[in-house]
């Protein structure tokens, strides 16, 4: 619709509207002039005019008015003042004419509109006249209405406004035709006023002369009417035509001057046409206003029609009722339209999206057009003319008389009064309507808020949908890594179970072999570094623990063992051949695919191809690729791959042995040794020491082979690979290195085959440089040394030495080597023949023990792998080894090795002597030396701790090594000196041995010394069985035998008592009574200790050839010195050297043992069986627990995350338990040492002999009391395992509950954090030519690295999956806003720099402006962007400076993260509006609930706000308001430091994250926030109120004591006086209210106080001293707060008071109190439309002291007047606090302090009363006091508030208290027996403060 058409329609509607209104107003405001006529004459004249008017409309001209300009216009003149006198009016002739017919009677209502519309063509000229204005003129007291025209030379267009319709009561008027008074019918007269006033057409004679006027407030100055009107004035004003009923020429009218003018109420604006370009909100508002106007018009019409129905006859009622029905239906329609429009307005305000808004705009436009059409129809409605009964009257000639004028004026005054009354009534009704509409608006706002909440919930659902998508992204990203990590954790947990199962199977298989073999050395395997798995950052966040380094190893920082790494071989390895590319493709495929049944066949083909290609690799390439696929070992589908690789590796060993000859190796070694000496490189010489190192290397290779060549070890070791080359000699080629690498493997394979166990493999080995070996058991260090030629000679004599008779040619010479170091002198001086015999002896005796020991040692190696430190064996002190990386040298560990050995010796010595003391002292003697034993025990534990620290220490600098070594040695020397002192004070026997009979006889069995050869020295076993066979243990077993049997028979599974376990196993029972993993560790420790006892029993069985009853025992004494030298910690002590000499073929005598001794030793076999049963039960329960654990393998599962964290710490716990086990093993080192002191085999024995011995042993074991104890121990372990099962079931239940509770909080926050973390952490840089507006998240497979590769040369597997996040259009909008903000900042910086003469930001500013210009030219609307445009813009922006890209990456990411954060905060803050005002508990709960999710949020926010650049930024921290009172700052110095950092720094230096907010904050919102901050500061010292209350309570106590004494004096001499009370206990409860007004700009408060005081005092000679404690709880609510802001104070007050009686009726009272107030502030700030809640906790310390001097004056009327005067000093100090809350980044308030010194003057009157009821000494108390402040010192406060990106600072000056305060009070006191009761009331007031307080006191005289 164009503008022309719109104006045309507007003119048309206005004409129809005001034509209708003019016709309606005929009977209400008819113009008159001259003498009034009668009513009948007026009606007749009006009927004639109407008839003429209708005839003119129908085309007939009126004879009385031929002017064409008057057609279609109605001139409604204002009522004029009558100029006729009363006498003239009375003389008028009044004639009664017949009633005229109504010309519109037969015209239907619908045709009225047509009739009026026909006059449109005849009134065109009338629209060019300026509209007249209307004014109200007052003549004296009477009010009249006048009209005038205003003409302007300029064309103006006046907007149409809503007409004002005033309904007045019926009043007499004057007809202009009849010049007589008439009375209108009883219908309300209607006066119409409008900006478009009635006018007279040009050239038309006016019916009234001009009248002076005064303009009203809604009119403009106009010209006069009548003759003064300029003719032919043509204007563009939109005047409304009037129908003129004037039929006569101009008439005279008297002029009445006006003296008063009263402005008229301005008319309401009419409907404004909608502009073409207006917002939807303005359109809706205009529509609602338009509908309201239409509805109001309909109401007016209804009122008129209703009145007309009541006053008309029956003929017209039917027509009027139809009209009434139409108006009613129209009104209902408009009401519906209005409600619909309001709903649309609400929806537009909420705003879902722009498309919906456009639809609503179209709908509103159509509704508005419909409303216009409806309004036009309403305007056309006309009230039938016949509703007014018009009676014709005769025309009376007009005469002038003063009396008639006065009467008319009086009549007019009554009319005006009536109109004014109606106007006032309408005005009051309008005011009520406005109030009701305001209430309606408030209700609508509430409804709107409810709708907004529903919309917010919808947005939250959208966020949840996005979270689900993020969950899918995270799940796909973690799919590969999580599975591997979980498998590794499970394998780590059940690794021990599988190892124990194998041990059990091997023991069962080796049972018949163990009994016919001798004890041989066990092989200690070198502990390996804990395998590590490189994980992605996503998995690390799931596990909740940061990695140790950038690669992200799945090992906790505290317990991660540094991997051992060989020094890199300078010899280049083989280059990668063509097969490596295929292998890499296969490996990538296996990493990316998810195994299932459908693709299993394809996986098998890939496995076959991979194995075929790897078969072609060299050793290095094979090991490297093997490390890359090690993480796949836990997947069942890939088991076949590792079986094939194992076969390939074994085949390579055999091939290598065939290829290389010994001569090549010897020649290579000789060249290497010579070159090394020339280059000053230390070389192992061909001596026994060198061979010891070589042998140790073979042990390491044995351990490596056992752990890396089995399918089971592949699952538990991800670094399964071959070791690095051993030699770095440039002359040693690749073949030699490989042969050296595999020679040890071949040696170990031979060791596993007892029938081929020879030493020929020693001829294949060469020394290695910098070889890392682990600590091995002492039993493994019996290594044969000699030259290579001697070793080769042994091979030819192998078959000759395999006979059993070779023992006749052997002689044994056992002695110990020095314990500190290994030197070349420590050799085995043996002949080749004796060496052969030693080898055969080991092969025959330990054929089964090797495998058993290897499995046990493999289990211990895995358990110790994370804590034990590998050492470099370096006899000459010149070998080093890389520790973790090349910067950490092993020299630190080599230096302190001497201290480790020294600590080990000291531990063994302490343990041996402690055991000796226990064995050589009786129970009665043991009590006397208990303190000494305790000191020894403490020293023993301290030595163990020092040894552990020495093993774990890692020092880089040599000077630090020496200092640490000296410090450790100093501690060890101190321990040794203390131990020697303790041992010297205890007298014990020198002989320590094994006494099977008990008592104090301690000697050791040995052979007959007379017949032993002189060159054979035998070190007998020491302390064997001392634990189980001590007198105390036997006595204990006998005492508890019956108890154990009963418990077992009744099925009771009792936990083992600590004393029982200590006596039976020498192990603390707390280990058994705790968690099952610790029980497992102790069971393993017992199993290890039992190994030595099995060897002892084995030797005993093999030696026993005579019947057990005939055995005898020979004992040999052993000194303490020998015992100490033999008791060496097993991991450090070398085995004794054995020297063989030719003793011809003499046989050794058979040692004799008692049968009882064998019985005791066989009990150890039972111990082994019972331990195996324990392990079986544990394995079953652990498998059940693991099955339970498998139920929680969902990566998003919270319980699984917790279990994953526990699994990470498993290695640390195992390490701790291992250390504890080692400490316990030290106590049994003597027993384990016995395995190395074997006596040579003298003769063979048969299986029948062994069977007989075993049957006897079983019968003895069945009677052994230790069996019962072990069964109970087993039962105890079963109970612990049952508890483990119940614990896992409880975890499942708790997890389900926790999952339900945290679904809407923790999961949402965590997942949102995941989204933003992926968005920020993986955001690419522009320098890498990646899109600026796109984010990518890549998840790589696990990167495995070889130990022999440097960190810089590790191969990283390419990512297998890349997930591109959809481009977001918000990036563009955000980018634009960031650039705009940055331009402003740079311009500000430039202004400052220009002043200083420097400008460094101009280049960056130019780049930013270029980017802005490009974006503004390319982008007109962000909504029109698509993905291609975004990419094009991105490519263009990359051409700009890198600073722009960095800017986007840093700030835009931050803003987008804050967008999500704001949505979360808004959704979380939705419950704020639901909190009822005044409900403190519910509000506290709600605030706590909102802020308790924020610690998660804290960690989730930290991820959401993480930035991609390298700059350090602090993340937004949302404080926890639920912390308890213990979190308060304790010291004022710390508080001052905190506020100093906050208040003295500017916005950039504040420790607050600078975040750009997306919420636009208007200036008004900022001002409002600043006002709130200035008003809500807690600076009015509310804590001072509490101190005043408490002081009043205690002062009343002192006054009560004084009153009682006065009452007793006033009672009279005839009354009996109570006994003198010396002590009193009293309590007082109080309740009070207070009110503080506004001070300056500080908000006042209202508060309540409630509390209690308890005190105790003593009275001595009328002098009182006492102490009291008060606890008061106060709540202060701030005034002028719509958010229920309040302050809670919990006060603890301690007071000391006293009263001293002075001469001459004087008394002195003193009071000192100190209070500690815990304050909580709860404040809500209104920041625009945002409500920000904050919570604060801080402390206040207050101190008060006062002294009062009283004088007691007793009157004759028994009244007591007590005036008093005194001083009071008060000090209050608030602590610093930091305030945090939702959307509040930080609020800080400095410490404030207030000191007041005041004086007190008052008096008190006591009125005694007669005794009533059971009360005596009754009295009334009236008191008053005036307190004046002499000096008050306050402190200025600095406050800093940071909300979003706006910082508010405010400085406060605490307002001083009023100088004068008043305290008034009254009370009543009385006593019953020894109890005193008083009621008190106090009223305290000053200029700003009022307080009421009531209390009840009860005192009991003790």
Swiss-Prot record:
Compositionally biased residues, Polar residues:
146-159, 168-197, 225-238, 423-439
The annotated regions of Acidic residues compositional bias extend over 1521-1538
Give the SUPFAM superfamilies listed for this entry. Answer: Autotransporter
Q: Provide the leader sequence positions.
A: 1-28
Q: Which Pfam families match?
A: Autotransporter
**Subcellular localization, per the record?**
Cell outer membrane
InterPro entries given in the database record: Autotransporte_beta, Autotransporte_beta_dom_sf
Instruction: List, as start-end ranges, the regions of compositional bias called Low complexity.
Output: 199-212, 246-264, 1491-1507
Please list the residue ranges that the record marks as compositionally biased, kind Basic and acidic residues: 445-482, 863-874
From the Swiss-Prot or TrEMBL record, give the protein name. Putative surface cell antigen sca1
SMART domains xrefs: Autotransporter (SM00869)
Name one cellular component (GO) term.
Answer: cell outer membrane
* Record domain Autotransporter: where: 1618-1902
**Which residue intervals make up region (Disordered)?**
140-273, 420-485, 707-729, 858-885, 1470-1548
The alphabetical list of record keywords is: Cell outer membrane, Membrane, Signal, Transmembrane, Transmembrane beta strand
């Amino acid at each position: 619709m164009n503008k022309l058409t719109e104006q045309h329609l507007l003119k048309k509607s206005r004409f129809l509207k005001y034509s209708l209104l003019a016709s309606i107003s005929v009977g209400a405001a008819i113009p008159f002039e001259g003498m009034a006529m009668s009513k009948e004459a007026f009606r007749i004249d009006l009927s004639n005019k109407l008839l003429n008017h209708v005839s003119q409309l129908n085309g007939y001209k009126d004879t009385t008015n031929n002017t064409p300009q008057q057609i279609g216009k109605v001139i409604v003149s204002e009522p004029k003042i009558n100029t006729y006198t009363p006498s003239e009016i009375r003389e008028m002739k009044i004639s009664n004419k017949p009633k005229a017919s109504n010309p519109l009677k037969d015209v239907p209502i619908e045709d009225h509109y047509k009739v009026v519309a026909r006059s449109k063509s005849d009134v065109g000229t009338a629209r060019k006249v300026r509209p007249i204005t209307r004014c109200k003129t007052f003549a004296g007291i009477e009010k009249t209405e006048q009209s005038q025209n205003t003409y302007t030379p300029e064309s103006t267009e006046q907007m149409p406004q809503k007409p004002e319709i005033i309904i007045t009561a019926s009043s007499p008027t004057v007809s202009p035709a009849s010049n007589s008074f008439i009375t209108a019918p009883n219908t309300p007269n209607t006066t119409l006023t409008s900006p478009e006033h009635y006018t007279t057409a040009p050239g038309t004679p006016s019916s009234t002369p001009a009248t002076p006027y005064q303009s009203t407030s809604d009119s403009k100055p106009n010209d006069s009417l009548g003759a003064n009107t300029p003719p032919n004035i043509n204007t563009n004003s939109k005047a409304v035509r009037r129908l003129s009923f004037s039929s006569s020429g101009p008439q005279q009218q008297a002029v009445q001057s006006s003296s008063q003018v009263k402005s008229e109420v301005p008319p309401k604006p009419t409907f404004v046409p909608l502009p073409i370009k207006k917002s939807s909100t303005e359109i809706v508002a205009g529509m609602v206003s338009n509908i309201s106007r239409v509805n109001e018009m309909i109401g007016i019409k209804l009122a008129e029609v209703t009145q007309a129905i009541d006053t008309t006859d029956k003929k017209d009622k039917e027509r009027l009722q139809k009209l009434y029905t139409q108006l009613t239906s129209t009104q209902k329609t408009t009401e519906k339209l209005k409600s619909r429009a309001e709903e649309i307005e609400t929806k537009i305000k909420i705003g879902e999206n722009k498309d919906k808004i456009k639809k609503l705009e179209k709908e509103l436009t159509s509704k508005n057009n419909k409303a216009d059409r409806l309004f036009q129809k309403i305007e056309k409605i006309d009230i039938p003319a016949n509703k007014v009964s018009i009676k014709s009257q005769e025309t009376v000639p007009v005469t002038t008389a003063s009396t008639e004028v006065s009467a008319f004026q009086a009549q007019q005054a009554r009319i005006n009064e009536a109109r004014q009354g109606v106007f006032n009534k309408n005005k009051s009704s309008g005011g009520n309507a406005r109030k009701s509409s305001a209430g309606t608006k408030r209700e609508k706002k509430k409804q709107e808020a409810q709708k907004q909440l529903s919309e917010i919930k919808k947005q939250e659902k959208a966020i949840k949908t996005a979270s689900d998508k993020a969950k899918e992204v995270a799940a796909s990203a973690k799919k590969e890594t999580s599975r591997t990590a979980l498998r590794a954790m499970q394998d780590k947990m059940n690794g021990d179970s599988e190892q124990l199962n194998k041990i059990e199977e091997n023991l069962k298989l080796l049972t018949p072999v163990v009994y016919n073999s001798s004890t041989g050395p066990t092989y200690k395997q070198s502990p390996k570094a804990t395998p590590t798995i490189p994980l992605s950052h996503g998995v690390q966040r799931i596990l909740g623990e940061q990695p140790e380094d950038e690669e992200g190893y799945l090992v906790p920082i505290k317990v991660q063992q540094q991997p051992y790494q060989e020094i890199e071989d300078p010899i280049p390895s083989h280059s990668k051949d063509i097969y490596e590319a295929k292998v890499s493709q296969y490996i990538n495929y296996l990493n990316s695919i998810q195994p299932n049944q459908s693709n299993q066949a394809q996986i098998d083909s890939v496995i076959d191809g991979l194995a075929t290609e790897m078969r072609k690799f060299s050793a290095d390439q094979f090991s490297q690729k093997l490390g890359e696929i090690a993480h796949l070992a836990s997947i069942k589908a890939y088991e076949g791959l590792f079986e094939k690789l194992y076969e390939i590796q074994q085949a390579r060993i055999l091939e290598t042995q065939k290829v290389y000859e010994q001569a090549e190796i010897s020649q290579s070694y000789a060249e290497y040794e010579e070159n090394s000496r020339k280059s000053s490189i230390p070389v192992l010489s061909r001596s026994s020491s060198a061979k010891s190192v070589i042998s140790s290397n073979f042990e390491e290779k044995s351990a490596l082979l056992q752990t890396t060549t089995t399918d089971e070890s592949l699952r538990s070791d991800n670094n399964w690979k071959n070791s690095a080359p051993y030699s770095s000699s440039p002359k040693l080629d690749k073949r030699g290195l490989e042969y050296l690498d595999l020679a040890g493997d071949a040696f170990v394979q031979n060791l596993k085959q007892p029938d081929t166990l020879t030493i020929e493999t020693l001829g294949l080995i060469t020394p290695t440089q910098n070889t890392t070996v682990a600590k091995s058991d002492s039993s493994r260090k019996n290594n044969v040394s000699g030259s290579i030629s001697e070793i080769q000679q042994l091979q030819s004599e192998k078959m000759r030495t395999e006979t059993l008779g070779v023992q006749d040619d052997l002689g044994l010479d056992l002695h110990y080597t020095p314990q500190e170091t290994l030197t070349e002198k420590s050799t085995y001086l043996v002949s080749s023949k004796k060496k052969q015999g030693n080898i055969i002896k080991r092969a025959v005796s330990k054929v089964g023990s090797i495998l058993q020991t290897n499995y046990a040692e493999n289990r211990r190696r895995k358990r110790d792998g994370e804590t034990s430190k590998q050492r470099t064996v370096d006899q000459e002190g010149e070998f080093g080894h890389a520790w973790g990386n090349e910067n950490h040298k092993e020299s630190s560990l080599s230096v302190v090795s001497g201290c480790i050995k020294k600590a080990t010796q000291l531990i063994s010595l302490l343990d041996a002597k402690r055991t000796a003391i226990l064995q050589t002292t009786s129970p009665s003697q043991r009590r006397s030396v208990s303190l000494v034993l305790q000191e020894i025990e403490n020293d023993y534990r301290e030595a163990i701790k020092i040894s552990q620290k020495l093993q774990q220490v890692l020092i880089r600098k040599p000077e630090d090594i020496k200092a640490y070594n000296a410090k450790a040695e100093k501690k060890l020397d101190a321990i040794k000196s203390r131990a020697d002192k303790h041992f010297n004070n205890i007298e014990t026997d020198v002989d320590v041995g094994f006494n099977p009979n008990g008592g104090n006889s301690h000697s050791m069995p040995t052979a007959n010394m007379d017949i032993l050869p002189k060159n054979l020295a035998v070190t007998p076993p020491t302390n064997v069985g001392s634990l189980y066979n001590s007198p105390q243990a036997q006595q204990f077993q006998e005492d508890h035998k019956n108890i154990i049997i009963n418990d077992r028979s009744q099925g009771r599974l009792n936990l083992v008592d600590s004393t029982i376990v200590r006596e039976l196993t020498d192990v603390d029972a707390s280990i058994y009574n705790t968690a099952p993993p610790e029980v497992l560790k102790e069971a393993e420790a017992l199993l290890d200790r039992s190994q030595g006892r099995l060897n002892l029993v084995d030797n005993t069985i093999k030696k026993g050839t005579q019947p057990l009853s005939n055995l005898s025992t020979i004992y040999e004494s052993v000194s303490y010195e020998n015992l100490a030298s033999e008791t060496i910690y097993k991991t450090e002590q070398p085995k004794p050297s054995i020297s063989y000499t030719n003793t011809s073929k003499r046989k050794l005598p058979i040692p004799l043992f008692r049968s009882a001794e064998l019985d005791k030793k066989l009990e150890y076999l039972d111990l082994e069986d019972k331990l195996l049963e324990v392990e079986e039960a544990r394995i079953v329960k652990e498998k059940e627990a693991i099955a339970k654990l498998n139920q929680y393998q969902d990566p998003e599962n919270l319980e699984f995350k917790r279990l994953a964290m526990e699994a990470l710490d498993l290695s640390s716990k195992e390490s701790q338990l291992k250390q504890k086990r080692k400490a316990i093993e030290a106590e049994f080192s003597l027993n384990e040492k016995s395995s190395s002191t074997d006596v040579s085999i003298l003769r063979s024995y048969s299986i029948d002999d062994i069977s007989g011995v075993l049957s006897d042993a079983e019968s003895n074991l069945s009677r052994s009391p230790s069996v019962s104890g072990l069964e109970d121990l087993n039962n105890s372990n079963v109970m612990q395992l049952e508890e483990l099962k119940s614990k896992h079931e409880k975890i499942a239940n708790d997890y389900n509950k926790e999952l339900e509770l945290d679904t809407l909080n923790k999961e949402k926050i965590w997942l949102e954090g995941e989204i933003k973390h992926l968005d920020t952490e993986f955001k690419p840089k522009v320098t890498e030519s990646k899109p600026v507006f796109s984010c990518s998240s890549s998840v790589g497979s696990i990167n495995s690295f070889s130990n022999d590769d440097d960190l810089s040369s590790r191969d990283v597997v390419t990512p297998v999956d890349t997930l591109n996040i959809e481009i977001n259009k918000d990036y563009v909008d955000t980018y634009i806003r960031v650039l705009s903000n940055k331009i402003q900042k740079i311009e500000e910086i430039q202004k400052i720099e220009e002043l200083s003469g420097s400008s460094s930001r101009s280049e960056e500013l130019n780049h930013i402006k270029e980017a802005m210009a490009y974006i503004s030219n390319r982008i007109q609307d962000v909504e029109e962007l698509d993905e291609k445009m975004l990419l094009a813009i991105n490519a263009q922006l990359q051409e700009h400076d890198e600073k722009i890209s960095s800017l986007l990456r840093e700030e835009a990411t931050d803003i987008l993260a804050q967008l999500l954060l704001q949505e979360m905060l808004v959704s979380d803050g939705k419950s704020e509006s639901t909190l009822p005002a005044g409900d403190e508990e519910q509000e506290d709960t709600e605030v706590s609930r909102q802020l308790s999710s924020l610690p998660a949020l804290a960690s989730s926010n930290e991820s959401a706000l993480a930035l991609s650049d390298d700059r350090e930024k602090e993340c937004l921290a949302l404080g926890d308001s639920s912390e308890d009172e213990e979190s308060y700052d304790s010291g004022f110095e710390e508080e001052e430091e905190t506020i100093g950092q906050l208040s003295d720094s500017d916005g950039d230096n504040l420790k607050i994250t600078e975040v750009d907010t997306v919420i636009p904050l208007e200036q008004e919102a900022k001002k409002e926030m600043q006002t709130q901050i200035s008003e809500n500061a807690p600076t009015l010292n509310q804590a001072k109120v509490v101190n005043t209350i408490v002081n009043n309570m205690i002062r009343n106590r002192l006054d009560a004591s004084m009153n009682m004494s006065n009452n007793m004096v006033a009672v009279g001499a005839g009354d009996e006086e109570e006994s003198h009370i010396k002590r009193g206990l009293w309590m007082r409860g109080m309740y009070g209210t207070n009110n503080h007004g506004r001070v300056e700009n500080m908000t006042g408060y209202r508060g309540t106080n409630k509390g209690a005081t308890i005190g105790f005092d003593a009275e001595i000679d009328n002098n009182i001293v006492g102490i009291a404690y008060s606890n008061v709880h106060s709540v202060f609510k701030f005034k002028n707060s719509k958010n229920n802001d309040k302050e809670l104070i919990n006060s603890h007050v301690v007071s000391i008071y006293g009263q001293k009686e002075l001469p001459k009726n004087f008394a002195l009272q003193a009071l000192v109190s100190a209070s500690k107030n815990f304050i909580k502030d709860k404040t809500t700030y209104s920041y625009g439309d945002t409500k920000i809640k904050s919570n604060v906790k801080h402390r206040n310390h207050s101190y008060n002291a006062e002294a009062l001097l009283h004088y007691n004056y007793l009157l004759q009327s028994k009244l007591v007047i007590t005036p008093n005067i005194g001083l009071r000093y008060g000090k209050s100090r608030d602590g610093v606090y930091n305030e945090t809350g939702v959307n509040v980044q930080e609020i800080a308030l400095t410490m404030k302090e207030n000191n007041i010194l005041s004086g007190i003057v008052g008096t008190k009157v006591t009125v005694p009363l007669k005794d009533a009821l059971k009360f005596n000494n009754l009295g009334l108390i009236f008191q008053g006091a005036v307190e004046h402040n002499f000096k008050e010192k306050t402190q200025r406060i600095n406050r800093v508030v940071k909300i979003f990106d706006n910082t508010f600072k405010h400085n406060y000056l605490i307002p001083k208290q009023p100088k004068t305060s008043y305290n008034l009070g009254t009370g009543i006191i009385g006593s019953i027996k020894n109890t005193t009761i008083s009621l008190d009331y106090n009223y305290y007031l000053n200029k700003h403060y009022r307080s009421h307080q009531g209390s009840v006191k009860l005192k009991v005289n003790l």
